[in-house]
Amino acid sequence: ALNCASGWSGGYDQHCYKVFDIPPSWAADEKFCKQQTSGGHLV
């Protein structure tokens, strides 16, 4: 079973997910995602 950090959802394709409400800008949002966790990416 996949164990995700508190506040994160998981299970799909063995990845954890979290929804953030932040202003749209792909480059800034990708940077934000990478800062949240190792290997994080905007999807």
Swiss-Prot record:
Keywords: Calcium, Cell adhesion impairing toxin, Disulfide bond, Glycoprotein, Hemostasis impairing toxin, Platelet aggregation inhibiting toxin, Secreted, Toxin. Its main location: secreted. Its cofactor is Ca(2+). Expressed by the venom gland. It is found in: Secreted. It comes from the Eukaryota. Glycosylated. Disulfide bonds join 4-16. GO terms for cellular component: extracellular region. Residues 1-43 form the C-type lectin domain. Signal peptide: none annotated. GO terms for molecular function: toxin activity. The keyword Calcium applies. InterPro entries: C-type_lectin-like/link_sf, CTDL_fold. Belongs to the snaclec family. Heterodimer of subunits alpha and beta; disulfide-linked. Binds to the platelet GPIb/IX/V receptor system and inhibits ristocetin-induced platelet aggregation in human platelet-rich plasma. Strongly inhibits platelet aggregation induced by ADP, calcium ionophore, thrombin and collagen. Does not inhibit U46619-induced platelet aggregation. This is Snaclec lebecetin subunit beta. It comes from Macrovipera lebetinus (Levantine viper).
